[in-house]
Curated annotation (Swiss-Prot):
Keywords linked to the UniProt accession: Mitochondrion, Ribonucleoprotein, Ribosomal protein, Transit peptide
Subunit structure: Component of the mitochondrial ribosome small subunit (28S) which comprises a 12S rRNA and about 30 distinct proteins.
The keyword Kinase is annotated on this UniProt entry: no
Domain of life from the UniProt record: Eukaryota
UniProt-recorded name of the protein: Small ribosomal subunit protein uS3m
GO function terms (MF aspect): structural constituent of ribosome
Residue range of the transit peptide in the UniProt record, numbered on this chain: 1-35
Length: 167
């Protein structure tokens, strides 16, 4: 009996102390740690893995052997809204992947010129022409109304995925 009374008293003292410390209730994190380190390049296999030109070169070759996949002035010194443009880029890429499911042959290139957004992509010839034209018009119209600026899709069709080399 005396033991339970002392434990109860200890618990009340801990609660009293934690109420005095601001933020003491929010310091315990119970989520699992996910510390994965991965290089942003394709792993070398047995020579049977097809890769595109963008995937074949490591990220440190940007502006030397390969170009940027998002062209805008948001990252220049003194420019605002770089984070918003990055989120817009992620949304546009996911929108295009969902609108053309399994039809994109390579990465999408996003270009911002003044008040216009240009989306350039290689598309596989898996859809009939009338469905393809409908999806292009649907995407341009919906994105133009959403971003309140002209959005143009510049798409090229290819018969199969373009393979640069096998790794």
């Amino acid at each position: 009996m005396a033991w339970s009374a002392s434990v109860r008293g200890l618990g009340q003292r801990v609660l009293a102390c934690s109420r005095e410390l601001p933020g003491a209730w929010r310091t315990l994190h119970t989520s699992a740690v996910c510390a994965k380190n991965r290089a942003a390049r394709v792993r070398v296999a047995k020579g049977n893995k097809p890769v595109s030109y963008e995937e074949a070169h490591a990220p440190h070759y940007i502006a030397h052997r390969k170009g940027w996949l998002s062209l805008h002035t948001g990252n220049l010194d003194g420019e605002d809204h770089a984070a918003e443009r990055t989120l817009e880029d992620v949304f546009l890429r996911k929108f295009m992947m969902g609108t053309f499911p399994g039809c994109l042959a390579d990465q999408i290139v996003l270009k911002r010129r003044a008040n216009q957004v240009d989306i350039c992509a290689l598309v596989l010839r898996q859809l009939p022409a009338h469905k393809f034209y409908f999806l292009v018009g649907y995407s341009e119209t919906l994105l133009s109304h959403f971003y309140k600026c002209p959005v143009r899709l510049h798409l090229q069709t290819v018969p199969s995925k373009v393979v640069y080399k096998y790794i």
